[in-house]
Amino acid sequence: MKKILLYIILFLSGIDGAWALPIEKEGMSIYSPSLKQEVSYAIILPEGYEHSDTEYPVLYMFHGIGGDYTSWLEYGNVARVMDKMIKEGKIQPFIMVIPDGYLSYYSDTYDGSSLYETFFIKELVPYIDNNYRTR
């Protein structure tokens, strides 16, 4: 009986932090006329986003070469870091968007063959502003 009680206590103590994490959404996508393809992105919404009408600032995070839109979530653990810093009062709540940059260097090419900068400024930012409560 003591062994079962110990397992239950360990299990419950391990899940309390999970309830407090911000909302992570991976595999979201937007079609880009500039790039002529779907562009995947991840978005992290602050805790309480779903139950409020608060508008939040947005931070766009870009991954490095060889990474993708999930890199910051998988290797950088940004959702936990973001949540911890908000709870410690070091930063205010915000929305984080991590678009897939492919091998674009996040800029338009001189010959116009890749228009990632155009996509970001004219398509992604307005899309996020229109579909999420941003300020």
What are these regions, as identified by a protein language model?
Residues 4-14:
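Sec-dependent N-terminal signal peptides
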